[in-house]
Amino acid sequence: MTIYHFVGIKGSGMSALAQILHDKGFQVQGSDVDKYFFTQKALEEKQIPIMTFSADNINEGLTIIAGNAFPDTHEEIERALELGLPVIRYHKFLGQLIDGYTSIAITGSHGKTSTTGLLSHVVGAIRPTSYLIGDGTGSGTKNAQYFALEACEYQRHFLAYKPTYAIMTNIDWDHPDYFKSVDDVFNAFETLGKQVKKAVFALGDDEELRKLSLDIPIIYFGFDEENEFQAKNVIKETTGTRFDVYHRDEFLASFEIPAYGDHNVLNALSVIALCDYEGLPVEAVKKELKTFEGVKRRFSITEKGNQVLVDDYAHHPSEIRATVNAARQKYPDKKVVAVFQPHTFTRTRTFLQGFADSLNLADEVYLCDIFGSAREKTGNLTIADLAHKTKGNHIIKEEHTEELLKYPGAVILFMGAGDVQKFQAAYEKVLDNEVVTKSDFKKSAIN
């Protein structure tokens, strides 16, 4: 039996796919840079070997699954080609893997990971379901009927998939290093829609998705009355959100989610619509929606001292706005401080004013240096260009996060798609030292 070797196994999709193959009984290993990523924890728990990149890792008997970030000139891929080993790109392998299942591809400019996680949680509790989530989580469930997968639009990679269903959460202009306009993004989504076998579930409140022209049913969901599935009577509370769902103007049921913001209501509504279409019992769907704890790096909360620290993947103006609004809902009486690390120079330059406008919805704003990508390590702007447009003109360094101590009782949002987690980790150490220092002070005062 072949051994599957993943080139770039710590990538979020690659990590999830490796776990799926492992669960299905295949022998799996992989390689990556010698740096810790949160995605490797699950790999280590399943005892999947992780090596540092080296041509010496490549031997006879391997099938190479190559991450899309690595060119054919990568040393491991070059060696594999020299040896005549099968080399297949991540998205193409996944496209082959989902055949034979009732597959559900979740795509959209924003909300893919959260919606894939929610769908996997709900459907997986009702029917056997395999899933691949963009937070690095994957499961190859035995005798699975359904396969839920996050489908990324970047470089049109999702066109390798021909799923049974697709959920389209929204269309927005992102990845400006590849997509030239929102029309370019729309064309990619419509092309995917033409490959879907049974039906597309699309946000009807999105003017771009309303333009879809397909030969299969398009089931629209949203807040507007013309949608086939409509969320009404939304009640936002500090413990979550409640809402009613109407199907073709007839009451379906009332639902409750332990999540915040309109975007999470819409994510849940897409799942409700698909489950109803597939005939899954509404009471079971209601039960599972109430117990979803979220996905990694999506409004992940840590309480430290009197502050609330939130880790979030938000890296586009629309996502920052949604994250700030969610914080306002859950913590209406707290000050909101945004700590943001822009991801890629092209995105930062393209959406500079949009980033400023979204960040300024917070009470205070701190900016980290721009995180470059493997394809784009430098650019013709700096973080100062964005800082000049935001509240306070604050730039924060990893070694000086103690500035955030100025906001006792605040919610501090650490946002970005790069390595902004290291800023949160540094600040947590500052907070831990504060506790120790105060404890020592009390002891000396007593003595």
Swiss-Prot record:
Q: Name one GO cellular component term.
A: cytoplasm
Q: Which GO terms describe its biological process?
A: cell division; cell wall organization; peptidoglycan biosynthetic process; regulation of cell shape
Classification via InterPro entries: Mur-like_cat_sf (IPR036565), Mur_ligase_C (IPR004101), Mur_ligase_C_dom_sf (IPR036615), Mur_ligase_cen (IPR013221), Mur_ligase_N (IPR000713), MurCDEF_pg_biosynth (IPR050061), UDP-N-AcMur_Ala_ligase_MurC (IPR005758)
**Which family does the similarity line name?**
Belongs to the MurCDEF family.
Q: Where does ATP bind?
A: 108-114
Q: What is its EC number?
A: 6.3.2.8
| Record SUPFAM superfamilies | MurCD N-terminal domain, MurD-like peptide ligases, catalytic domain, MurD-like peptide ligases, peptide-binding domain
Q: Which gene encodes it?
A: murC
Q: Is this entry keyworded Ligase?
A: yes
- Supply the PANTHER family for this chain: UDP-N-ACETYLMURAMATE--L-ALANINE LIGASE, UDP-N-ACETYLMURAMATE--L-ALANINE LIGASE-RELATED
Task: Cite the source lineage.
Answer: Bacteria, Bacillati, Bacillota, Bacilli, Bacillales
Pathway involvement? Answer: Cell wall biogenesis; peptidoglycan biosynthesis
Places the protein is found:
Cytoplasm
**GO MF terms held by the record:** ATP binding; UDP-N-acetylmuramate-L-alanine ligase activity
Protein name in UniProt: UDP-N-acetylmuramate--L-alanine ligase
Q: What does this chain do?
A: Cell wall formation.
Catalyses:
UDP-N-acetyl-alpha-D-muramate + L-alanine + ATP = UDP-N-acetyl-alpha-D-muramoyl-L-alanine + ADP + phosphate + H(+)
Q: Which superkingdom does the taxonomy of this entry point to?
A: Bacteria
Keywords (alphabetical) are: ATP-binding, Cell cycle, Cell division, Cell shape, Cell wall biogenesis/degradation, Cytoplasm, Ligase, Nucleotide-binding, Peptidoglycan synthesis
Looking up Pfam families in the UniProt record yields:
Mur_ligase (PF01225), Mur_ligase_C (PF02875), Mur_ligase_M (PF08245)
